[in-house]
Design a protein with these regions (language model features):
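Two-component/phosphorelay signaling modules centered on CheY-like receiver
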Residues: 14-32
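As written
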Residues: 63, 99-105
Length: 126
């Protein structure tokens, strides 16, 4: 596997977070995890992901608010980081907002199997 190997997973549900972690580690990804915006921004101080998997519904700041900050504030160094929204929200307005804010993809959790995550990440490689 080349390319996007450092992944930051931002998911507030610990069971889902762990399930995704196991799958990605098994496929040789280096994973850091966060359950909310505070943990995410702390992780970004020392971890520089190639890809961020970002839930929309998070405690505190929403995934869309986080996405906007990551894309517009250079202090996070994520303007060119691949960011995929993983959410249970299928409303067109939410998906459109995510793409307008700079998401590289929007995946509805119920439409995929967790084992599909590595292929989703691989599809983002230039």
């Amino acid at each position: 596997m080349a390319g996007l190997k450092n992944v930051l997973l931002v998911e507030d549900d610990p069971m889902i977070r762990e399930m995704y972690r196991i799958i990605l580690v098994d496929r040789q990804y280096k994973i850091e995890m966060a359950g909310n915006s505070e943990e995410l921004f702390k992780k970004l101080e020392t971890f520089h992901p190639d890809c961020i998997l970002l839930d929309v519904m998070l405690p505190g700041m929403s995934g869309l608010e986080i996405l906007k900050l990551l894309r517009t504030d250079p202090k996070y160094g994520c303007q060119k980081t691949k960011i995929v929204i993983l959410s249970n929200l299928a409303q067109r307005s939410v998906t459109d907002s995510a793409i307008e804010l700079g998401a590289d993809g929007y995946v509805i959790k119920s439409d995929i199997l967790p084992k599909d995550l590595p292929e989703i990440i691989s599809s983002l490689e230039d």
